[in-house]
Amino acid sequence: MNKKYEPLHDDFPATNVLKRSQAIFGRDYQMGIVVEECSELQKELLKNTNRKKDNLPEIIDETADVYIGLLHVIISYDINGPVAQRVKEKLDRLNERLKIRETTSSVEEYTKAIEAKKAKEAQKVK
């Protein structure tokens, strides 16, 4: 990749700790932990939203674990720049969709507007 990206974490202080962890435990082991932590966060979020459980401390704890796990993924695959670029693109797209939603009166109208925008963009590609 020749693109220049603005990194998510440039010289992030935890980088050395995370690299040591991968050197000691191995990348595959760490990726398994990341999957496990994502599952634990999912469980806590579902408890909160579906069962209305007051579990903010657990959500904070699992979010921190997932955040560390995502840093493991970024470092392990050396994808800091490309991930930063995709985050920017996805936030830009969300911002555009929010602008559309703010000008529509219903979810149905919003959905039609998004579909029309996609069709228009597809025509540009042809």
Where are these regions (language model features)?
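Flexible "arm" and connector segments at domain edges
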Residues: 1-126
